[in-house]
Amino acid sequence: MEAPAVCLLPLLLLLWAWAPAPGRASPEALPLVNEDVKRTVDLSSHLAKVTAEVVLAHAGSSSSPRAASFLLALEPELEARLAHLGVQVKGEDEEENNLEVRETKIKGKRGRFFTVTLPVALDPGAKISVTVETVYTHVLQPYPTQITQSEKQFVVFEGNHYFYSPYPTKSQSMRVKLASRNVESYTKLGNPTRSEDLLDYGPFRDVPPYSQDTFKVHSENNSPFLTITSMTRVIEVSHWGNIAVEENVDLKHTGAVLKGPFSRYDYQRQPDSGISSIRSFKTILPAAAQDVYYRDEIGNVSTSHLLILDDSVEMEIRPRFPLFGGWKTHYIVGYNLPSYEYLYNLGDQYALKMRLVDHVFDEQVIDSLTVKIILPEGAKNIQVDSPYEISRAPDELHYTYLDTFGRPVIVAHKKNLVEQHIQDIVVHYTFNKVLMLQEPLLVVAAFYILFFTVIVYVRLDFSITKDPAAEARMKVACITEQVLTLVNKRIGLYRHFDETINRYKQSRDVSTLNSGKKSLELEHKALTSEVALLQSRLKTEGSDLCDKVSEMQKLDAQVKELVLKSAVEAERLVAGKLKKDTYIENEKLISGKRQELVTKIDHILDAL
């Protein structure tokens, strides 16, 4: 009878290990209740900002375990658009303290779920007030999707009338803040009240868990629908006192697409023309920023303005053209920072504390961000502390002046960022200060090698030959090669002028022909002068090729006369002084003579 007891012992131990400890329970199993929920849905920009003030109560009996955390849920329709989620609770000093939020999964339930750790475990019957902030991107959809320059922009937002929660809610209300008072339509659940640009829903009582009812509003919204589709931020750290920052930004207006043509005249004359377009925006740079530049593919953009304030540097960025719906632009902003404000060290231990992403414009949305942090050559034991989850790519190497084995580059990626992501990232690394002498020593060594090479070169004779005749032949060959190049350029001038004559015959624009003549005369004169100069050099060298070049010059003068004669014939044809048949016959004769002269010139060139 001993054997069955021995077999049951491992099973009992396993069950004891999986059993919940006294005073602990999973958040979804706790009897928590939302006593009161007040939601504010801010749709005044192109972002949807939802703030929920929740009074959470522990509705269990005195024997129930304490609640150390609770669950937050997001609707399946909005989960993919979530950019930021934060939970705060007011402390004793009335300051809002952020709570730890970790994503989790609930079997059999759709949507995203998060576990929020409370600062103090909640006893049965106790309550706590928390504030939940969420920011969604690309949830305000333009409708209609295309508008003309003079039309206003309307958008549609779809959400939930109820606070989506795994717990029952006793009472809840919702206030919707719109961008304007012009509202096309909105859902009427519970007879909402409307005042100017506000919609008030509720209170709704005794709402079951996971309740959903579609809330929809269609209203005017002309706020800037500006989106950074892609951004690359490069931070280059130098231990010589400077940190260089450069941002490559791809911008797009993600509002209603412009339908029809764009009128610059109407845009300047009528204040409400293109009301949803973007003329300019302000970027806030660090207060210590200096040597600021702003450029695009064309070059430096002079329409920007820089304002230095006490706590920041304000830069007004004005693209070369206003941005309408669907329009894109690309630009680069760069500046330098003193390293003593962001780089700290203790011996060989260094810590760089900078923002992963900085302010670009108000209510910013960044679809895709790539950050590259270039550390000094020789940095090792690199560690990155980020305030939120980022995707690290394999480290790279960057080579610049006087580098030997490359500078380590930290590469990080992040998608769907908003202003709440403007937080500091800390990079720890070790660096041997002796390596700071590497670059100065390389410069000294380079100059030493240069001076030594010059000394050797001056004192030694590296000439291959002392034959004067061979040197003279080399000089003549070099001059001949230059003559060939110049002659080919002159022939190219004649072909280009032939094209000008053809365009003149089609457009009948005398200015086109006159401009072509002037260009031909100037360039031909310059080329002929250079050939004459080379001819005199050949004569100085005593080469018999001088006579051939002289003959070629005479033939070229005849070719030029025939080319200009073709232009005169074309003018007579366009003016009606010459019949077309006669013009064709004359043109054939001129072309034949030109071809003969060009053939003679080619024979001379072959003989050179």
Swiss-Prot record:
The chain crosses the membrane at residues 436-456. Detected in liver (at protein level). Residues 25-435 are lumenal. Glycans are attached at N300. Residues 457-607 are cytoplasmic. Residues 1-24 form the signal peptide. It is a single-pass type I membrane protein. Its main location: endoplasmic reticulum. Pathway: Protein modification; protein glycosylation. Ubiquitinated by the ECS(ASB11) complex. Keywords: Acetylation, Endoplasmic reticulum, Glycoprotein, Isopeptide bond, Membrane, Signal, Transmembrane, Transmembrane helix, Ubl conjugation. It comes from the Eukaryota. InterPro entries: Ribophorin_I. There is a cross-link at K539 (Glycyl lysine isopeptide (Lys-Gly) (interchain with G-Cter in SUMO2)). Subunit of the oligosaccharyl transferase (OST) complex that catalyzes the initial transfer of a defined glycan (Glc(3)Man(9)GlcNAc(2) in eukaryotes) from the lipid carrier dolichol-pyrophosphate to an asparagine residue within an Asn-X-Ser/Thr consensus motif in nascent polypeptide chains, the first step in protein N-glycosylation. N-glycosylation occurs cotranslationally and the complex associates with the Sec61 complex at the channel-forming translocon complex that mediates protein translocation across the endoplasmic reticulum (ER). All subunits are required for a maximal enzyme activity. This is Dolichyl-diphosphooligosaccharide--protein glycosyltransferase subunit 1. It comes from Sus scrofa. The gene is RPN1.
